[in-house]
């Protein structure tokens, strides 16, 4: 809009200028062109003013800047001044409103004496406005946030903003969740709270990731501590981790069941979408608190109060439901014991022990649950006693009303049963796998029917190192955008309130459906995360492998190759066996297990698989190095056996690629994404193994053959390189010759036996530019006086009909065929003073005359020579030409100012050669004078 408006203003100004200069009218095209010119002119002027402003440290231009800009554009200020004085000023025809309309500054600088100004950190300069103003924070507390994918979309209360740094620290400390936090308050809280926290670490992490979904609950976080139990319950869903960083990690662990409850409570899908990206929680302090709130509803009331105290955490959306809502929420966290009823009993038994004992408040069996409880206890002490009382009341109600919700527990336990069997497995990657399932369960319990976003996104946040947070957020957001619609349809039967425990059959269905839904999205997210982590690990491994390979190269290469072949086969078999075992399970389980067991369990399986992979890589590298070394040794042998080797080569490459293929297929999760890939890969495995077993000897032969081939190729390359070097040397020589203006270089070795016959050899060098004429000469004393070099002039090309050049050439020079011009032996001895001096000795001399064929001579496709006149750079057109007796360049007569052919006896030299002759004469005279 501004551009078109400004262009119309320029158009009016152009018309006014033309009118002021006396024009009555102007063509449209001319007006458009002038408008464009004026626009560019003003833009250039403005750009120059702006640059000079910046150069001198000003924000607004002054008159000096405009003057400098005019000078930069080549405008003489004096002339401009005269022009303005001599022409009447023309005012613009219209009033121009200021555009674009200036907007008020929205930056919320704190007022002096305000809370923000007092709390402002010293290292923050005064000119930096706060990211979020206190007013905005208050509004956020009052108004529920819209669904958004970004972490900032989740509104955070004022307190949270103040504690942003604290939240970040808390997020970082999620890894510290195992560390027990001992606080006197921990024992004060009823065991019911503990059970939620005590839920297996994986559950807590899942809750932390997923709870984000209900953004509406964010408002509840700000609810005053005195809230009624109903409000407390809502806030409990939000239950944010205590402001203390250590507390956050334990809450995340216990929150796995709670996220389900939270998801069930949130009425609006928008909130779910926000919370759905679990990665965001860990990434942004704001998001993290909400997942914590999503934690178990029982402990949530206390956590809610904590959230009130800790601004960073109070993000979990509060459930729109009335106090009854906790009934649905509590079942998953409150009664992990009940899951035993469900067919998932086996899985629940593992998790159930931890969850049930912790919830009962008896003795948490696993150390992980204890630290979680302790962490929560630390968080709880922060809450006011009044809040604690209300929370206790809410908890008591929830305990009375709630029946174990097998769905929620099962959702956590399904994936967790395997993952959480040992506290070690509770590694971040495992928790990520479990989190998606709880989210699905929450979707089922949700009466609102909001489409739950697959929780799989949550897995990413904890799995990857903190540096990967940004990339993880993007991945989670993308996953959340695509997946939310599917789960609700599958879980329609779960819409009924979770107050009454469903029958075990629905649990099985839910479990299968959850695994299916979660598997696709989770697998993708896991794959992305794992790929990132693996890439880093692979780089480190490669560096280690390089160092190892260097050390190993010192050892005997032959023994290494044998051992490597055997070990490589074994490793390949082992890896493929694992893949085949995974294939036996349904594809969804296969994906989950691969990523949870092989990739996500960094502590357990990563050590074995990575070690094997590293060994495999190291072996390959060592093999390659060994091959190179052997190639060097075998080069001599290869020459003899080159014929046999040519026939054998193809076999070796066929055997090796399968080995190389096996590693990437197993190591890279991307290959696993498509289940269709698995069947195609599985048939290949036995064949590869079979080849590896039966053909160890063939492999050795193939390796030798490959080495021989490589040696042959190297020999060929060496020959090519030698040829190229020779060519380069020739080119250099030619350049030097041109620099010396085609001087003759003569080497004169003494020949013991003089021979009256003068055999002559003419050799073509390079692209026909140099002729090496070797002749045996019996020098005669007459040669001394002949200082000028008499050399046959190479005649113009045969096709030229003009006889003139032939007349120009001296009589001794025959007209030879252009491809091989010859030099008459009689002319050679006097070629240079060196030869004449040698002639005085009467010793027979073999002279090698390097005759430079002018660069102005080119051979065409048929081998014919084409002469170019150096004067005009045009080819021989049949007009008369004259050749230089020294450099053999042929010139058109007009180019050198000749109108008639000179006498044949007279030698003709071009300007270059004539100057050389003069220089030589001057040098000789100087030497003689000495």
Curated annotation (Swiss-Prot):
Residue spans of biased composition, Low complexity class: 274-291, 448-462, 674-686
Domain of life: Eukaryota
Regions of compositional bias (Basic and acidic residues) in chain numbering: 540-578, 599-612, 621-648, 688-699, 712-737
Gene3D superfamilies: Histone, subunit A, Zinc/RING finger domain, C3HC4 (zinc finger)
Region Disordered, residue ranges: 128-151, 175-381, 404-507, 519-578, 599-755, 782-820
Biased composition (Pro residues): 793-820
Ranges annotated as PHD-type zinc finger: 866-916
Biological process according to GO: positive regulation of transcription by RNA polymerase II
A cellular-component GO term for this protein: transcription factor TFIID complex
Keyword set, alphabetical order: Metal-binding, Nucleus, Transcription, Transcription regulation, Zinc, Zinc-finger
Subcellular location as annotated: Nucleus
One MF term in the entry's GO annotations: protein heterodimerization activity
Assembly information from the UniProt record: Component of the TFIID basal transcription factor complex, composed of TATA-box-binding protein TBP, and a number of TBP-associated factors (TAFs), including TAF1, TAF2, TAF3, TAF4, TAF5, TAF6, TAF7, TAF8, TAF9, TAF10, TAF11, TAF12 and TAF13. Interacts with TAF10 via the histone fold. Interacts with TAF13, TBP, SAP130 and GCN5L2. Interacts with TBPL2.
UniProt function note: The TFIID basal transcription factor complex plays a major role in the initiation of RNA polymerase II (Pol II)-dependent transcription. TFIID recognizes and binds promoters with or without a TATA box via its subunit TBP, a TATA-box-binding protein, and promotes assembly of the pre-initiation complex (PIC). The TFIID complex consists of TBP and TBP-associated factors (TAFs), including TAF1, TAF2, TAF3, TAF4, TAF5, TAF6, TAF7, TAF8, TAF9, TAF10, TAF11, TAF12 and TAF13. The TFIID complex structure can be divided into 3 modules TFIID-A, TFIID-B, and TFIID-C.
Family: Belongs to the TAF3 family.
Annotated protein name in UniProt: Transcription initiation factor TFIID subunit 3
Gene that this sequence comes from: TAF3
